[in-house]
Amino acid sequence: YPILGTDSALAAEATYCADDQGKYWDYHVILYDYQGHMNSGWANADRLKSFAFNLDLNMDEFDECLDSSKYDERVKLNWQKASAGGANSTPTFIIVNTETGNEEKIVGAQPYSVFEKTINSLL
């Protein structure tokens, strides 16, 4: 959920570009470790590309993905879905039973027991 401003939206796109090469979580860790202040410009294209380079991604593929805004609509749709589900802060988790469509929201840093209870209630 890109709520930290313009930097977050482009960073979210970059994670999907990394995922094209099987490196979503590796890229996510780098973003988390090197994130800057909200709207400070920390997630500009050059910096995001340097993170990809450090993961030994195919840079031609990554650059094309990021430069073409391949995942712009996906990021916008995720933001719209999160907003419609009542997410307005991080962390917010929307747990969905894909068979029934029922969902529950968990807001804030919660202990495992809250997640366990929520998931079990949706089964």
Locate predicted features:
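C-terminal cap of thioredoxin/glutaredoxin-like
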Residues: D46-L123
